[in-house]
Amino acid sequence: MAGHGRARGSGAVGLAVLLLVLLVGCGGRPATDGVRTEVQRVLDRRAAAVLAHDAAAYAATGDPAGYARLRAVPLAAWSYRVTAVRPGGEGAEADAELSYRVEGHDRGPVTVARALRLTRDAAGRWNVAAEEPARGSGRQLWDQGTVTVVRGAHSLVLGVGRSDEQLRTFADLADRAVPAVSRAWGTDWARRVVVLVPKSLDGMAALLGSPASSYRGIAAVTTGETGGGADAPADRVVVNPDAFGMLGPVGRQVVFTHETTHVATRADTNAATPLWLSEGYADWVGYRGTGRTPEEAAPELRKAVRGDGPPDGLPSDGDFGFAGDAARLARAYEGGWTACRMIAERWGERELHAFYRAVGEHGERPGAVEEAMESVLGTTLEDFTAQWRRYLHDELG
């Protein structure tokens, strides 16, 4: 009997705990959902104000500072989707996805993670007190300052801390690069470029969400979705103004033509494409028509060839690491360029383009280069590498 009584008591306590859990769950969740709905409505009004260029409506949703910073950006879409809300006291923290499209350039949205802090006013209305990139997410250009916009014939340049005149020089470079790339690659691409010019190397690194040391000495990079589908946002050419400012006129144009080549070839570049081919081809287009010889354009590789002979093989993807040895990185780019230059000279420019596309069509790395070399160039990777090593000896030895 005693044991039976203890069992009954335990069950009663368990039932009470269960009811308490259910009551807390039923009472707490709707409250959080209600806050989430209200926060979403505030962000919907904020997004509508951005698209309508309505400064007063934007200010009515909270902190007005962000409006002036992005006012000049030509936007086709701007929206938020709340993913989490954490109420606390008289305020709340929220996580959201910001999706936007630049008018005339983005076919699909760019989506970035944002962190928001909200407060309630005396009437109980929610207001945005602060908005910033979520942890691990890059700082957008307008997070870094007021964006200035310059349009070119084939380009849209967005910059921070730069005058219209300074940004016009980047637009001119891009406007010359687009037709140069089309003459080499063809016209089956967007034939327009979005260029982002932050104030400094630190701004570039913040935009890309990486340490500044990763891009020191790198004049520009191109960001985009691998494969570049029909609904992909436009690639961005992101400039490192510190390194870019050290280049001469020819070097600046080569860099812009190189980066624009990445934009043009995006749809044919994927996991199957080795970096020696994608970077080498971009350099080949960049140097095309400049008259620069291998001795002039490949000084680090020339030094290596004259000191130790040609490398044993084509550059690996690991050789292209930005954070590694600068001389090794330079040799990798120069090695890729000379390989593509050799294909263009010995097989022809048409075959170089066909080879690039054939590698991408394979879809995955194993066998991609080997099969494309056999089907397009009629050679093997082993024989091609031997020819390239002799080519380096002849051109740089």
Language-model-derived ranges and their functions:
Residues R86-A92, T119-G124, E345-E349:
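A short, structured loop/turn motif at beta-sheet edges
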Residues R151-P274, R365-A368:
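Juxtacatalytic substrate-recognition/specificity segment
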Residues L70-A115, A243-G245:
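Surface-exposed, charged secondary-structure patches
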Residues P30-G34, Q40, D44-G91:
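Short solvent-exposed beta->alpha transition segments
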